[in-house]
């Protein structure tokens, strides 16, 4: 996933993105590191909306 790159492009820090999506900053960090997490489609949709991209762009 390209969460870190997309987040930085939007000039958001992890806490700001987490607040917009309704998850913890720690979970954003795990997503960005590629930790063994399996976000739901609902969460991917919220992330994509917050980052102003499609879900497909998010998971490329």
What are these regions (language model features)?
Residues 42-57:
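DNA major-groove recognition helix of helix-turn-helix/homeodomain DNA-binding modules
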Residues 8, 19, 49:
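Alpha-helical residues within the helix-turn-helix
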Residues 1-9, 56:
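A short, Lys/Arg-rich alpha-helix, primarily the initiator
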Residues 12-30, 35:
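Short alpha-helical DNA-recognition segment
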């Amino acid at each position: 996933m390209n969460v870190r790159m997309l987040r930085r492009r939007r000039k958001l820090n992890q806490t700001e993105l987490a607040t917009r999506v309704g998850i913890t900053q720690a979970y954003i960090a795990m997503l960005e590191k590629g930790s063994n997490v399996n976000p739901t489609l609902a969460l991917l949709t919220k992330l994509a909306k917050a980052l102003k991209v499609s879900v497909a762009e998010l998971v490329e």
